[in-house]
Amino acid sequence: KRYIWLAQKFRSLGWDNADIARQSPFQIVDPGFNAILIRSSLALAELADALDEAEVASQSRAFADKALGSMESLWSEALGQYLCYDRVAKTLVQSPSIGGLLAVFAPVPQQRVEEIAQTIRKLAEQTNYLVASHPPSAPEFDELRYWRGPVWLIVNYMIAVGLRDAGQTDLVQRIVD
């Protein structure tokens, strides 16, 4: 229902990104999406280096560095992971979603990787498969929906890649098994 309403609202705005950003009641900064963007920017920088495009490489790295710094404002010490930020309510969304764990897909600080790894290990005590989109004990958990349910294959893959890159190989094995 909400998705249909949003789609109709965005269509009424002519799919204009600026209007959508101003008028949408759904303005969430998601650490998972940002991790994907950061990693993509760093990959673009590597590609630009290989093509002798120093300016593109520099801009891409600068963007990634700035975004990584901004990610820290999304960290929740209490939950041991990053949280989404609601730009309308101007507050962190106190929901331990998989997006906050997906942040390890970007080169976040090693301390954060270790804390996220510990959070995932705690999740492993509640379920047979990692990584659940929400902890099975959380009220948001819905076993029939991948966004709030037991597993989400591509997101789990990206979490495993990020953990592997950060040296958390034992946990990677637990996720892929």
Predicted ranges, named:
Residues 45-65, 107-121, 163-176:
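Structural helix-adjacent loops and short alpha-helical linkers that scaffold large soluble proteins
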Residues 1-29, 66-151, 177:
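Extended glycan-interaction surfaces of carbohydrate-active proteins
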Residues 30-45, 95-107, 149-165:
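Well-ordered alpha-helical segments within folded domains of soluble proteins
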